[in-house]
C-alpha cells in the first residue's frame, strides 16, 4: 500500500496510472552469458534511444550521506509525435563499493542493455570516477567476449548539461585514446535540481513516463504462465527484483516533501527515507528532455527542407 506525505510534491496517481510495462530488462547472470542465452530486450527499435543512469556511492566516501546508496537505472526512449516517451525498464540498488567494481557493473549494464548514453553524477567519487570510466576495463569472466574500451564525454553541446568548460576538462582527462563518446556527466546544483523536479512532475502528469507493473502483478503473471514452477529461487528473485525496485521508487517519490525558497524547489526525504532513486529518475528525464529538443529541431528542419523542395518544384 502506497502512502503520500501530506505536502508531497508528486501525486501517486500519476505513477499508478502509468505502471503499464509488463516486461523488465533482466541483466544476464554469468551462467546466462556462458550458456549464450539471448540478451533481455535484445530487439531495439530503429529510433529507440537507451540510457543507463547512475548515482554512485563509494566505500569510504565521507561526502555522502549515511543513507545514500548506489542506484542504476535503465531507461528507453520511444519517439511519440513530438517527444520521447520514457520507459523505466530496470532499477538496481546496492551499497557503496570500490570504484573499480562499481564502474565494472556500470559498463556491464551499458553493453548488456545496448545503451547509447551513460548518465552519471560526477560529484560522486570526484574526478576519480571519470578516470575509472575513461580507461580500459578488463572483465574477470567474459574475456575476449567483452569490449574493454574506455568511455569519454559526448562532444555535443545540445546534450551536455554541465558547463562546456567542464566537458573539455573531462575530455582532456580521458585515459583511453580510443574511448567511446557516450558519457553525460551531471553535477547537481540548486537550480538544476529545481528544474529537474519541475520537468519530472510535468512529464508524470502528462503520462509521458511509463513504469513496470507492480511486483505483485509480476509475481501473479509468473505463476499464471507456469514460468514460476521452472525457476530456481535465484532466478525468481532476479525476475521480480526490477518490479519491486519500481514499487520502492514510486514510494520514495511520493514521500518527498517540497520546500519553496527564492523561486526554487527543494525536495526533502523523510528522516529515515531515501531520495536516490528519485534523483536518478530526474537526471534521466533531464537528458531525455535534451533529446526531445534535439529531435524536434531535426524534424522541424526536415519539414522546412521538404517545404522548400515543394516550392521549388
Residue ranges and their predicted role:
Residues 1-154, 194, 198, 210-313:
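RNase H-like, metal-dependent nuclease domains and their acidic two-metal-ion catalytic environment used
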Residues 145-218:
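Short alpha-helix plus adjacent loop in nuclease-associated cores
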Amino acid at each position: 500500500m502506497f502512502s503520500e506525505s501530506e505536502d508531497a510534491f508528486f501525486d501517486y496517481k500519476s505513477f499508478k496510472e502509468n505502471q503499464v510495462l509488463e516486461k523488465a530488462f533482466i541483466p544476464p547472470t554469468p551462467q546466462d552469458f556462458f550458456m549464450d542465452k539471448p540478451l533481455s530486450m535484445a530487439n531495439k527499435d530503429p529510433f529507440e534511444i537507451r540510457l543507463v543512469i547512475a548515482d554512485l556511492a563509494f566505500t569510504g566516501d565521507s561526502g555522502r550521506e549515511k543513507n545514500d546508496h548506489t542506484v542504476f537505472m535503465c531507461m528507453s526512449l520511444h519517439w511519440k509525435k513530438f517527444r520521447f516517451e520514457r520507459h523505466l525498464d530496470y532499477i538496481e540498488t546496492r551499497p557503496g563499493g570500490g570504484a573499480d567494481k562499481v564502474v565494472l557493473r556500470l559498463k556491464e549494464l551499458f553493453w548488456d542493455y545496448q545503451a547509447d548514453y551513460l548518465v552519471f553524477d560526477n560529484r560522486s567519487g570526484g574526478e576519480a570516477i571519470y578516470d575509472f570510466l575513461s580507461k580500459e576495463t578488463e572483465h574477470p569472466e567474459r574475456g575476449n567476449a567483452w569490449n574493454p574500451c574506455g568511455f569519454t564525454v559526448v562532444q555535443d553541446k545540445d546534450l551536455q548539461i554541465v558547463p562546456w568548460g567542464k566537458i573539455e576538462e573531462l575530455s582532456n582527462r580521458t585515459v583511453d585514446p580510443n574511448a567511446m563518446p557516450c558519457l553525460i556527466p551531471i553535477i547537481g546544483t540548486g537550480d538544476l535540481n529545481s528544474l529537474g523536479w519541475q520537468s519530472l512532475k510535468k512529464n508524470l502528469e502528462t503520462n509521458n513516463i511509463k513504469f513496470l507493473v507492480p511486483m505483485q502483478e509480476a509475481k501473479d503473471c509468473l505463476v499464471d504462465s507456469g514460468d514460476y514452477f521452472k525457476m530456481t529461487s535465484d532466478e525468481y528473485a532476479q525476475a521480480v527484483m526490477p518490479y519491486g525496485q519500481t514499487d520502492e521508487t514510486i514510494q520514495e517519490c511520493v514521500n518527498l516533501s517540497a520546500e519553496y525558497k527564492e523561486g526554487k524547489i527543494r525536495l526533502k526525504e523523510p528522516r529515515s527515507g531515501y531520495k536516490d532513486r528519485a534523483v536518478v529518475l530526474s537526471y534521466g528525464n533531464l537528458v531525455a528532455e535534451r533529446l526531445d529538443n534535439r529531435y524536434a529541431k531535426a524534424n522541424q528542419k526536415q519539414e522546412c527542407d521538404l517545404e522548400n523542395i515543394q516550392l521549388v518544384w
